[in-house]
Amino acid sequence: MKKILTIVLASFALMSFAQKANNSYASNEQTVIKWIEDRPGPSFQQHRTFPDVPEALWNELGFKDGVPSSMSCFLLKTEGKTILLDTGLGAGFSQLIPKLAEDGIKPEDLKLIYITHLHGDHIGGLLKDGKVVFPNAEVYINRIEAEAWKAMPDNRSAQAKKVLEVYKDHLHLFEAGDMLPGGVKSIAAYGHTPGHTAFQKNDILVIGDLMHGEALQLKHPEYNASFDMDQKAAAESRTRLIKYARENKLTMYGMHLPSPEFVK
């Protein structure tokens, strides 16, 4: 089964979730987002990832095997630009480079990479053996995020610091709310990390790690994953952006949402 889901988004058509899950549809603008499943196969987040969730609620929601999840990134094509949103873990199992190749893209072809935050499963694909993987890419990272990781002890931030150093000549630090190349808007989604950022293009909202367990957190945004660095801010961002997406009829794409990797 092909692991890349292609959706061409239409600004003039309103379609049901079921239709979106099974069809591609075209627009005048031809904005396309593709799901890249970096770690193949089923993935589940266990109860220990959400320690504040009562046992009774966990069982009521039927999470016997855990909450369905994934490890993913996205390829966005819009306004003549091809943009990679996060780069996965960069481990031996990583499907990023093979999936880009299926789309006819070599690492040196990529010109734009937008990073939601500096955790290893989002920036690992930027380096191989400590060297640049995407030599011609301009890398965009929230300024608060970059500065926060620079200030952390090395035992927590060595990988992030390495990425920032190796890509320093191609690094662009933006402020939340800035419009990035391709008409992509950056949106503050702070809490999971200090400068965690979502990205919006038309009715696409890429939410990064806003949700680690969509089947739980879409209904109960007040529950955080243990990975969320600022628990209060993370819950507030999750609640705000879910509301924002619903009010504006946006489709959310997340790096840990299960297949088909998007949700209304």
Give the positions of each predicted feature.
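Cap/insert and terminal regions of metallo-dependent hydrolase folds
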Residues: 194, 203-264
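Metallo-beta-lactamase
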Residues: 4, 18-95, 109, 135-188, 203-209, 233-249
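Active-site neighborhood of phospho(di)ester-bond hydrolases with catalytic His/Asp-centered motifs
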Residues: 84-87, 111-121, 140-142, 188-191, ...
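Active-site metal-binding motif and surrounding structural segment of the metallo-beta-lactamase
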Residues: 93-140
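Short acidic/His/Gly/Ser-rich catalytic and metal-binding motifs that mark active-site loops
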Residues: 44, 148-150, 214-218
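Hydrophobic h-region of N-terminal signal peptides that target proteins for export
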Residues: 10-17
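Active-site glycine- and acidic-residue-rich loops that bind
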Residues: 185-198
